[in-house]
């Protein structure tokens, strides 16, 4: 199944985070924070402005992004994988290599 977001929505696959602290302590799943980074897997057509024009999204498929800890509260399971659906404005930054 393929997910096609509408308007300024973005679909993100959350990155796997290390469950070990800097001191080498392994964190149980309940104590580990959810990662706030991910990869964009689908992008909507853009935001509709007040004058009716559509502003294209600033992110594209494949971008590595950082988002806030409470962003992407909409989780969708697609082919057994949890994906986040959020507005483009919930993305804080694009990670450039």
Swiss-Prot record:
Cellular compartment(s): Cytoplasm
Pfam family, one: Cpn10
Keywords: Chaperone, Cytoplasm
Gene Ontology MF, one: metal ion binding
Listed SUPFAM superfamilies: GroES-like
UniProt keyword Iron present: no
Cellular component aspect of the GO annotation: cytoplasm
Function summary: Together with the chaperonin GroEL, plays an essential role in assisting protein folding. The GroEL-GroES system forms a nano-cage that allows encapsulation of the non-native substrate proteins and provides a physical environment optimized to promote and accelerate protein folding. GroES binds to the apical surface of the GroEL ring, thereby capping the opening of the GroEL channel.
HAMAP family for this protein: CH10 (MF_00580)
Assembly with partners or alone: Heptamer of 7 subunits arranged in a ring. Interacts with the chaperonin GroEL.
Family per record: Belongs to the GroES chaperonin family.
Name of this protein: Co-chaperonin GroES
Source organism (scientific name): Stutzerimonas stutzeri (strain A1501)
Gene name linked to the record: groES
